[in-house]
Amino acid sequence: CTLMNMNYQATLKSKAQHIRDCITRIGGADDVLRAMHGMEKPYAYRNRVQFPVGGKAGAPKVGFYKGNTHDVIDLPDGCMLLKPELNHARAIFAAWLRDSNLAPYDERTHRGIVRHAVFRVSRTGALMAIIVVNGSKLPGYEGLFRALERVGCVSLVLNELTDAPGSRRNTEIFGKKFVTLCGKERYMDEILGCQFELSAPSFF
């Protein structure tokens, strides 16, 4: 997003120069980077997103952090880089969270429930939703799953990430415990004819 004010070819040159500088500075190698090839349509391609949750009960913000802060900027119109299913999932989740009146987690007071929503979508349109909470429960999750099924959700997973009272700000996205609330424990994706079964914590 920080490069969206530049045209696409300029962003490719900027990224290539950054990589070239790192290879030279860290690896001590010069002239090893080949030409960078861009996409025909550099939008709506990202298949995974994590949305921090802010605001208050009844008026949540579901979006991204403002630069160099943990202040959540709401994203009602979605993100141009995300696949459409992810923007639809964000809107459904935000509406459900507002209507459920659940409190977003507050890093300063260590109170509230919902911390993050992470969505992943496969090339076939199968969606996995991972809701990160403070504690071990997500009241009303059945209604959320039914709503997300309209955009292809096949799995709703709860992740527990709880801070100890008096602890410093936790910058992690996931805790260690994942619990499948509805649907499948894994979903399928495919690359170059190879199929993969993916669980919530997998890196793909």
Language model features with spans:
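Accessory RNA-recognition modules of RNA-modification enzymes
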Residues: 2-204
